[in-house]
Curated annotation (Swiss-Prot):
PROSITE patterns attached to this UniProt entry: RIBOSOMAL_L24
Lineage, uppermost ranks: Eukaryota, Viridiplantae, Streptophyta, Embryophyta, Tracheophyta
Keywords: Activator, Nucleus, Repeat, Repressor, Transcription, Transcription regulation
Name of the protein in its database record: Putative transcription elongation factor SPT5 homolog 2
GO molecular function annotations of the record: structural constituent of ribosome
Protein source organism: Arabidopsis thaliana
Renumbered residue ranges of the record's region Disordered: 1-82, 790-852
């Protein structure tokens, strides 16, 4: 009637024998505890009884088993196994394991409570084991909850104690054969297994990412040498290196999670000439760890053609070719072999050039997954513009919009954000976010038929905005800017910036709704918005916009809106100096003064002056939306608001180039080019721009700030240097100090005379009535009419000219001279002028505003805006200027601004037929040459050379250096430096 079979009894007997052996094993331990052997003996006798009677009732078997459990539970030391922080409670044939701290012991239950618990009887069918485990865990956790909390804090500190110290074994770096790292580690392990404790090394480590080396853990270097002795894959003659203690923890680092690459995801290249370039994943081979990417090629077709022909230059190039789409037709023109092949793996057709595959201008390249960076790759809008392709409807669309938002930061979406689904079955579904989980986002949709809320993966969502919303850019190159959305194009937004008043294009995922208006980025490093800076190419400009990656600068090119985007490293320094200039009517203009532009492309605009440099004004016109309202123009093209509009004298004295002197003789000051020493620091060159001709600073130009004996101090654009005086040349005057015409042989140039300027009353033209033959009829000859063209022009320096009105100023005047009686010597008409600065014949008309009247000081100053005489040596350098058809000039009319025009013809009398307008589209007028002046050419403009050795040649301006222009001749392609005054701007019809 027993419910157990014989097999069950035999199995039970085997279990009892194992229990008996276990009790014998722990008997010494029980004696140490002072346990009584009476109860143990009773248990043994019971076991013998069971073995003696094999047939027992099911009830007796159950009772004996229960008693055994009672004894085992009571004997805490024998039945509680403590190993590695685990405590195991044994209940018959099953056990419960609890992970507890090593410092805490299991609680000693009250004996009465324990006895009462087991007297209820236990049977596997009467109570569920899971329920028993649950109640036991609750009892233990409740009693020691506080202790566990306190031990958690201790464990954090204990983790620091696990770091290696000087008492721990050392880590040694041993060099081995490449590719044999794992084999060396296995061989060392086999040695330890075979020979036991003979070797005293602890471990051997072979890392996958470290080739040619293995790590061996040992206490001493001698132990390592003994272990590696006789191994063929280890270089025994190489030095064994000790790993520093601080670097030991970094040796065994956890390998990062494998990157999950998918098609159409964006990556950046890490190696080669494509380093940093954006690429798109086309295919992924997870087995070989290789991917096929699509990127914009950087290929020099000419170098590729030379390589294929075998004429490649051995010299290595110092730069990588710029990214450019492949042009197959251009490659064929260079005789590069192009093959049209089909890829057997994908079935697509590619153009094969030298083993490289091209399609639609892109390069398809197979690379290793280790050579690309796929994490935190956020393409810029400009980069994605180049990867766009037309869709089935012919519209331009991105490949996969969801790939653009795969690298979002955590917490990107917030509750209440309007979103739209961009991928999956719910594509184009709009809604609002209610809750954000780890990866899924709960949204409430607009459609009533759908259940709310709906769980959608965060990668399938994008923020949604409507025109008119005020937003703030939270990421990207425009980060920090605010503005209003004016247009929504799919998931791209066009925003009107609050600061620049310009349209910027950003992704909808990069903005957030905001009512605040910020100024954006106004300072990066040492540079702030609207600073005047000098660039690396020595050009200057004003900062219009500051971004995290680039700086937008309006260059100082008058009447041209030349804007360049540079990096902060391309800026040399910032200009702090504030300069005052003069406007068209000689009114002083300073920073913050309001001026109005009266000529040029910006004519009619006005605003305050923000920066001034080299006669160029940077004006901010708040009504101008282009370039944040900034315009660039010359100071001579502006007038000061509220200033004097009276036309100044045509030849005013230049306060910078000449010293103000008395009419009488000043013995303390040396004249210009006369060799006089003068006072210390008092020289006519002070304040002028000079160029250094000799020495280590040869070729540098700057402003002369001080003269001291034979040395001068020149303020370069970068610093002030000291050079010898003979090593500089004046850049503000085109003529040289060599006396011209009949003055070359006079030594000294100005002979001694006492007094040099005699007293005369009246001072000029004493006794001349009428003055200068004013009543003569006709008044004067045609040769001396300043308004009558002369071919060739003549002046009073030609001694052989019978029509000359005067003699040499250094000869005694003969009777009948028109100049009146004066002591032989230099006329007192001017003071301290150079021999080349004697004026032409004075006009008898009074008053007169022509440049033929004597001036103080003498000579025609090169003041901007002053009409130059056709005979002036300043025009054309060493040769006279002859106007030719097809060049752009300025026509000066009385009471009007300078009007641009194009010379259509030059008449025999020297006058010009000019068509007004920048391209000659206006009316045609006739003007004399003294009413016409050249337009100064700018960089990259084509010019005609009007004087000098290359007169009549055409060239292209490639740069400016003060008063000189750097041109490239069209015929010989030579680079020449010529005066800007002989360069005429050509007009392209």
């Amino acid at each position: 009637m027993s419910q157990y079979s014989d097999d069950d009894y035999s199995h039970e007997d085997d279990s009892e024998m194992e229990d008996e052996d276990e009790e014998d094993e722990y008997e010494p331990r029980s004696s140490r505890k002072g346990r009584s052997g009476k109860k143990r003996g009773r248990s043994n006798s019971d076991s013998d009884g069971r073995r003696g009677s094999k047939k027992k009732s099911s009830g007796s078997a159950f009772i004996d088993w229960e008693v055994e459990v009672d004894d085992d539970v009571e004997d805490d030391d024998d039945d509680v196994d403590v190993e590695d922080g685990k405590q195991q409670l044994k209940f018959g044939d099953f056990s419960l394991c609890f992970i507890v701290s090593g410092e805490a012991d299991l609680p000693n239950e009250d004996s009465d409570h324990r006895r009462q618990y087991y007297q209820r009887g236990f049977h596997p069918h009467e109570e569920d084991v899971d329920e028993l485990e649950k109640r036991t865990l609750e009892r233990l956790s409740t009693k020691y909850a506080k202790d566990d909390y306190e031990l958690d804090d201790v464990n954090d500190v204990d983790q620091q104690a696990l770091l290696p110290s000087v008492r721990d074994p050392k880590l040694w770096l041993v060099k081995c054969a490449i590719g044999r790292e794992r084999e060396v580690a296995v061989c060392l392990m086999q040695k330890i297994v075979d020979r036991g404790s003979e070797f005293k090394i602890r471990s051997a480590i072979a890392l996958d990412h470290l080739q040619n080396y293995v790590y061996i853990e040992a206490d001493m270097e001698a132990h390592v040498k003994e272990a590696i002795k006789g191994m063929r894959n280890i270089y025994a003659n190489q030095k064994i290196l000790l790993v520093p203690i601080k670097e030991m923890t970094a040796v065994l680092s956890v390998e990062s999670k494998a990157i999950d690459l998918s098609r159409d995801s964006w990556v950046r290249m890490k190696l080669g000439i494509y380093k940093g370039d954006l690429a798109q994943v086309v295919d992924v081979d997870n087995v070989r760890k290789r991917v096929t990417v699509k990127l914009i090629p950087r290929i020099d077709l000419q170098a590729l053609a030379n390589k294929l022909e075998g004429t490649e230059n051995v010299k290595k190039k110092a730069f990588a070719p710029p990214p450019r789409f492949m042009n197959i037709d251009e490659a064929r023109e260079l005789h590069i072999r192009v093959e049209h092949r089909r890829d057997p793996m994908t079935g697509d057709y590619f153009e094969n050039i030298g083993g490289m595959l091209f399609k639609d201008g892109f390069l398809y390249k197979k690379v290793s997954t280790k050579s690309i960076a796929a994490q935190n790759v956020t393409p810029t809008f400009d980069e994605l513009e180049r990867f766009k392709r037309p869709n089935e409807n012919g519209e331009i669309d991105f490949v996969d919009e969801s790939t653009l938002f795969a690298n979002r930061k955590k917490g990107h979406f917030m509750k209440g954000d309007a979103v739209i689904v961009i991928k999956g079955d719910l594509k184009n579904l709009k809604g609002w976010i209610e809750k954000v989980d780890e990866e899924n986002v709960l949204i409430r949709s607009e459609m009533k038929d759908l259940p709310n809320p709906i769980a959608v993966n965060g990668r399938e969502l994008c923020k949604y905005f409507e025109p008119g919303n005020f937003v703030k850019v939270v990421s990207g190159i425009h980060e920090g800017g605010t503005g209003m959305i004016v247009k929504v194009d799919q998931h791209m937004l066009i925003i009107l910036s609050d600061t620049t008043k310009e349209h910027i294009c950003v992704f909808a995922d990069h903005v957030a709704k905001s009512a605040e208006v910020t100024k954006g980025v106004t300072k990066i490093g040492d540079y702030e918005l609207h600073d005047l800076v000098i660039l690396s190419d020595f050009s200057f400009g004003v900062i219009l916009k500051l971004d995290s990656e680039a700086i937008q600068i309006l260059k100082g090119v008058p009447d041209s809106s030349e804007v360049s985007i540079v990096k902060a490293s391309e800026i040399k320094y910032k200009i702090w100096k504030k300069i005052n200039v003069q406007d068209r009517y000689k009114n002083v203009v300073a920073v913050k003064d309001v001026v109005r532009v009266i000529e040029g492309p910006s004519k009619g605009k006005q605003g305050p002056v923000v920066q001034i440099y080299k006669g160029v004004l940077f004006i901010h016109d708040r009504h101008n939306l282009e370039h944040t309202g900034f315009i660039c123009t010359r100071c001579s093209s502006c007038v000061l608001a509220g200033g004097n509009f009276k036309t100044p004298a045509l030849v005013p004295p230049s306060p910078r180039r000449f010293q103000r002197a008395d009419m009488g003789y000043n013995p303390g000051a040396g004249g210009r080019h006369q060799g006089g020493r003068g006072r210390r620091g008092d020289d006519h060159l002070v304040g002028t721009y000079v160029k250094i001709r000799l020495g280590p600073f040869k070729g540098y130009s700057g402003r002369l700030v001080e003269v001291k004996d034979k040395l001068v101090r020149v303020e370069l654009e970068a610093k002030i240097v000291t050079v010898e005086r003979k090593a500089i040349s004046d850049m503000t005057d085109n003529v040289v100090a060599t006396p011209q015409y009949n003055m070359g042989s006079q030594t000294p140039m100005h002979p001694s005379r006492t007094p040099l300027h005699p007293c005369m009353t009246p001072m000029r033209h004493s006794g001349a009535t009428p003055i200068h033959d004013g009543m003569r009829t006709p008044m004067r000859g045609r040769a001396w009419n300043p308004y009558m063209p002369m071919s060739p022009p003549r002046d009073n320096w030609e001694d052989g000219n019978p029509g000359s009105w005067g003699t040499s100023p250094y000869e005694a005047a003969t009777p009948g001279s028109d100049w009146g009686s004066s002591t032989p010597g230099r006329s007192s008409y001017r003071d301290a002028g150079t021999p080349i600065n004697n004026a032409n014949a004075p006009s008898p008309m009074t008053p007169s505003s022509t440049s033929y009247l004597p001036t103080t000081p003498g000579g025609q100053a090169m003041t901007p805006g002053t009409d130059l005489d056709v005979m002036s040596l300043d025009i054309g350098g060493d040769a006279e200027t002859r106007f030719i058809p097809g060049i752009l000039v300025n026509v000066h009319k009385a009471g009007e601004d300078r009007n641009p025009g194009v010379i259509r013809d030059v008449l025999p009398d020297g006058s010009c037929v000019v068509a007004l307008g920048h391209r000659g589209e206006g009316e045609t007028i006739r003007a004399t040459q003294n009413k016409v002046s050249l337009v100064c050419p700018k960089k990259n403009e084509r010019v005609k050379i009007l004087g000098g050795k290359y007169c009549g040649s055409t060239a292209k301006v490639i740069g400016e250096d003060g008063q000189d222009g750097i041109v490239k001749l069209d015929e010989s392609l030579d680079i020449k430096i010529l005066k800007l005054t002989i360069l005429a701007k050509l007009v392209h019809e």
